[in-house]
Amino acid sequence: MAATGTEKQGAKAYYVSTPIYYVNDAPHLGHAYTTVAGDVLTRWHRQRGEKVWYLTGTDEHGQKIMRTAEANGVTPQAWADKLVTESWKPLWEHLDIANDDFIRTTQKRHTDRVQEFVQDLYDKGEIYKGGYEGPYCVGCEEYKLPGELLDGEGEYAGQKLCPIHKKPVEILSEENYFFKLSEYSEKLLAHYEANPGFVQPESARNEVVNFVRQGLQDLSISRSTFDWGVPVPWDDKHVIYVWVDALLNYATAVGYNENPEKFESTFPADVHLVGKDILRFHAIIWPAMLMAQGLPLPGKIAANGWLMVGGEKMSKSNLTGIKPQDLTTHFGVDAYRWYFLRAIAFGQDGSFSWEDFSARYTSELANDYGNLASRVAAMVGKYFGGELPAATADGDAEQAIHDGLTKAVAEADRKIGEELDFQGGILAVFDFVKQVNGYITEQEPWKVAKDDSPEGKARLATILYTAAEALRAVAVLLNPIMPDTSQKLWDSLGAEPSLGALADQHVQDAADWGRLPAGATVTKGAVLFPRLEEKPAA
């Protein structure tokens, strides 16, 4: 579902991607965390008036999916179709994800272009045939270096384990085709040096730089021990390595070798959002592939941390995954979208707890934000019959609100729009919400209302206009994060008849004071954040 909003035409799109997710099981909170972050980022840029392209999708080839399908008694394609149709796409719709495209690596628009890309590298001499033997993790779909492996304990005693999946690796020996990745070490290091923000956060950048400095090995880009994948075009006994196949979705989805106009106006991505466990594929292999093909590199690779449950990474393979619907049923979709970006600094690991979510929901959403909206609408209804009065008695207190809004808009726009500091941007807006609450507490409009003098009436009108106009700006700033409740607030303020659709309001202009006209019809709608029910039994 694409979000609405006016966009600049003709310019290159601000292009953001999530990883394409494995369809070996249904999505969990970790997948939704990255996808919501990308949705907020692209909605924010769309509300800057920019042309935007947001891509997500599913990775449907490889040994892991083949084995999962076999275990469920179906073909890999049937398994992928079932998961995409019943789990992945419905969840993104449920979470109000406004992606512009959903690519599947089994689609012909992808597989044909993957073969063309790899054939071109082969023709250029970038790919050669060789043999390889080494420890292989099926979960990662990757050969591991011996030094990366963990010593097994308990049921895995005496075996070597993948450091990510904590499962035994398999020793594979096969004849493969190799990409000359080792020849790109210096070029990659030069790019990291010239573009210090290419990999974020800094800890991720340091990991990548240190890994490349140790020297890169050539990359095995084909497999011959199974057949669920894209065939190597010049040797159908091999299928293309699933990660080479998967990474190319960022090009094939926007018209590589098929729609030059679309490709030139979209590629490369401005931001690839990835989990830190797949950082090396995106920050090393992907740019090297693009260099080999003479294509431009992405703007930045932003690695988010892991969501932890009981001290372990949340994942499908260790069964710590929690369904997002378990939370949205209780807290609502908008609160869900807000919580993880508010509670966890993007790029760092973070722990989820039901208790923390409940506490933040009650304190920040219900008490601070929702209660402010409810109080202001109620007072405009009580004292002015629901018609927003004009402000004619501005003073220092109102100027402080104007200044606070200017600061909040600039800070939120910089932090979310440029730095991907979603937590910092959300805090900037909610600090302003607290400032407006403090303003109402200090100005005591319920007491001012008892003064029937012209001065008293003007003062009351000014207080309530100031609060309502502040909420107008808050609705604009929070729309990329909580679109449903922001629309409810926009409707409550009676803003649309004079200002137009909420999606068309530019975030960078939200501090322009006085946009909400006197005379707007303010109504007290439904409570934005209802009181929570008791936590359901486990």
UniProtKB/Swiss-Prot annotation:
Location (main, coarse): cytoplasm
GO molecular function, one term: ATP binding
Compartment(s) of residence: Cytoplasm
Cofactor note: Binds 1 zinc ion per subunit.
Binding sites annotated in the UniProt record for ATP: K316
One cellular component (GO) term of this entry: cytoplasm
Record CDD domains: Anticodon_Ia_Met, MetRS_core
Keywords: Aminoacyl-tRNA synthetase, ATP-binding, Cytoplasm, Ligase, Metal-binding, Nucleotide-binding, Protein biosynthesis, Zinc
Residue interval(s) of motif 'KMSKS' region: 313-317
Cofactor: Zn(2+)
Biological process (GO), any one: methionyl-tRNA aminoacylation
Keyword flag Protein biosynthesis: yes
UniProt KW DNA-binding keyword: no
Reactions it catalyzes: tRNA(Met) + L-methionine + ATP = L-methionyl-tRNA(Met) + AMP + diphosphate
UniProt EC number: 6.1.1.10
InterPro entries on file: Anticodon_Met, Met-tRNA_synth, Met-tRNA_synth_2, Methionyl/Leucyl_tRNA_Synth, MetRS_core, Rossmann-like_a/b/a_fold, tRNAsynth_Ia_anticodon-bd
Segments carrying motif 'HIGH' region: 21-31
Subunit structure: Monomer.
Family in the record: Belongs to the class-I aminoacyl-tRNA synthetase family. MetG type 2A subfamily.
Protein's job: Is required not only for elongation of protein synthesis but also for the initiation of all mRNA translation through initiator tRNA(fMet) aminoacylation.
Name the UniProt record assigns to this protein: Methionine--tRNA ligase
Gene expressing this chain: metG
